[in-house]
C-alpha cells in the first residue's frame, strides 16, 4: 500500500491535471513516450513523493524532444512495490 500523498504532491498532481484537461487538448497528441509525460509525472509523484517524483518527471520531460526515439518508459518501481519470489 502506498503512503498518503503529501500536500506538495497533491498540488503538483492538480497542476498536471489542469494541463491534461485544458492545455494538452489544444496542443494535440505529440508525446514520444508511453505513458505520456503527464501520466508519468502523476504516477511518479504518487509512487515517490514530491521530491523524487518531481526529479523523475523533470528528467522525463527533458528527454521528450525530436532527437530522442521515445518508446516505452514506465515509472521505476517504488519502495512499496514488493514481489514475492
Swiss-Prot record:
Subcellular compartments: Cell inner membrane
Name of one Pfam family that matches: YidD
Membrane recorded as keyword: yes
DNA-binding listed as a keyword: no
Lipid bilayer topology: Peripheral membrane protein
PANTHER family listed in its UniProt record: MEMBRANE PROTEIN INSERTION EFFICIENCY FACTOR-RELATED (PTHR33383:SF1)
Listed name of the protein: Putative membrane protein insertion efficiency factor
Organism: Escherichia coli O157:H7
Origin organism lineage: Bacteria, Pseudomonadati, Pseudomonadota, Gammaproteobacteria, Enterobacterales
